[in-house]
């Protein structure tokens, strides 16, 4: 793929129409969010074109907020290795032409026995005694948005001192209208933070691009996509998972969950352990125990590949979760709304999106 990725495949709105209050050369820092999924690169490419058009490409950074072993891992099939989400985010950044030194990966940590170690979301859930759900999504705020803001705090402080004014940031997301009703209503451009340190404009330049257009664009550009999207690694048929978020996301649709349970049985069993010990179902519509049982029935999605989930990183997660479950839950469960529909909403609305009003 060429370093300067050209977007001539689809007619899109002119950049000026997409961002009437955002002047490309007045943005001090472009933050391009890459999850390893299909939508981030499509949005990032538009933002990169805008920055390049006015000669400020050096202000562009890509960032990936890693969820560790809860993300889709790398797999090797028939001697071919297919990268996991974190690795793929870095590959996407390079393919788009962003220098490696301007790609940032962040992951939440905490102190354990005098050293900083990864602090995974499932450990937090086990400690807390309940699962994320709409309106209470630590997977979005504490494991993504907060870390992303924090990663740029030192840069913002330095730039503010240099400029003598708040630093203008464009937080570029791959949110698209056809992912969910909530995302359809979400504006393509909005200001999420405005204080003495920074002004953050959340920009979703691929908001009106359809799912099929994203897939076609990805294939046409020769951009590698996450293997979880396919019926089996290397198929290139987009007949696997519909979304690439956490492997087992509480907001995923039922087919995606059944497919993930079959592809990552060891992770599913760990989720089921948390569910069983804390006595709280995975989400209001279904339990992980039920999903595991349904995934074993005839007619369940063919996994195409089954990951072993072996290695020190997963073992550390398992040990941390088991240790957390030996202690009382840190807070009482709250009452979650129970939707009547059998299928779950098909999107994790706002992953790494609504930035907290944090100062640098």
PLM feature spans:
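Nucleotide-activated chemistry modules centered on ATP-dependent adenylation/adenylyltransferase
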Residues: 2-360
């Amino acid at each position: 793929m060429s370093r300067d990725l050209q977007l001539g495949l689809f007619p899109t709105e002119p950049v000026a129409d997409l961002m009437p209050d955002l002047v490309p050369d007045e943005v001090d820092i472009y933050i391009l969010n890459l999850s390893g999924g299909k939508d981030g690169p499509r949005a990032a490419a538009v933002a990169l074109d805008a920055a390049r058009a006015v000669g400020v490409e050096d202000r562009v950074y890509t960032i990936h907020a890693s969820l560790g072993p809860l993300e889709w891992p790398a797999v090797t099939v028939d001697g071919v290795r297919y990268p996991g989400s974190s690795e793929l985010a870095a590959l996407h950044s390079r393919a788009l032409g962003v220098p490696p030194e301007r790609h940032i990966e962040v992951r939440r940590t905490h102190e354990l026995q005098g050293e900083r170690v990864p602090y995974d979301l499932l450990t937090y859930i086990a400690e807390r005694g309940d699962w994320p759900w709409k309106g209470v999504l630590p997977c979005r705020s504490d494991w993504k948005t907060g870390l992303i803001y924090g990663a740029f705090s030192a840069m913002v402080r330095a730039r503010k001192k240099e400029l003598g004014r708040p630093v203008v940031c464009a937080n570029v997301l791959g949110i698209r209208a056809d992912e969910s009703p909530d995302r359809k209503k979400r504006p393509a451009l909005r200001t999420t933070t405005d204080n003495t340190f920074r002004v953050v404009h959340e920009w979703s330049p691929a908001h009106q691009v359809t799912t099929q257009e994203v897939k076609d664009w990805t294939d046409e550009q020769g951009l590698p996509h996450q293997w979880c999207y396919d019926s089996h690694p290397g198929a290139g048929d987009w007949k696997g998972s519909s979304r690439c978020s956490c492997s087992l996301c509480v907001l995923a649709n039922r087919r995606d969950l059944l497919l993930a349970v079959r592809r990552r049985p060891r992770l599913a069993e760990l989720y089921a352990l948390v569910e069983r010990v804390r006595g709280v179902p995975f989400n209001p519509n279904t339990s992980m125990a039920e999903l595991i049982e349904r995934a074993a029935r005839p007619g369940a999605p063919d996994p195409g590949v089954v990951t072993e989930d072996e290695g020190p990183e997963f073992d550390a997660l398992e040990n941390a979760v088991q240790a957390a479950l030996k202690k009382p839950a840190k807070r009482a469960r709250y009452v979650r709304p129970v939707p009547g529909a059998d299928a779950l909403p098909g999107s994790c609305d706002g992953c790494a999106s609504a930035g907290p009003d944090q100062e640098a």
